[in-house]
């Protein structure tokens, strides 16, 4: 089976969760198109599906994180954002510290 390139899977639920934290769809889609993301499994929330957390920065340089999973629709792998937000100050400092160690 041939799998096409990534797209995004949006519905009213995940749009609402992301907007709640001041982020728009374009912010999140742009975030995933960057090459400087750090992605790790979200083992605490992966009971019914495999979830991941991506750490990186917005185009304006503001640290943010996105919880997401993958969905396959019509042989295309889609990124399904679950929630997205800007990092809290403590998280951002930890991310910056770890980023220098990678």
Language model features with spans:
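Ribonuclease/tRNase effector modules and their secretory precursors
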Residues: 1-102
């Amino acid at each position: 089976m041939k799998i096409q390139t990534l797209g995004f899977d949006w519905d009213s639920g995940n749009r609402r969760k992301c907007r709640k934290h001041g982020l728009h769809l374009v912010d999140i889609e742009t975030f995933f198109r960057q090459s400087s993301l750090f992605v790790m499994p979200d083992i605490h929330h992966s009971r019914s599906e495999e979830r991941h957390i991506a750490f990186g920065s917005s185009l304006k340089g503001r640290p943010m994180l996105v919880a997401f999973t993958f969905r396959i629709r019509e042989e295309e792998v889609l990124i399904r954002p679950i929630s997205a937000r800007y990092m809290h100050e403590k998280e951002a400092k930890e991310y910056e510290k770890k980023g220098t160690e990678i």
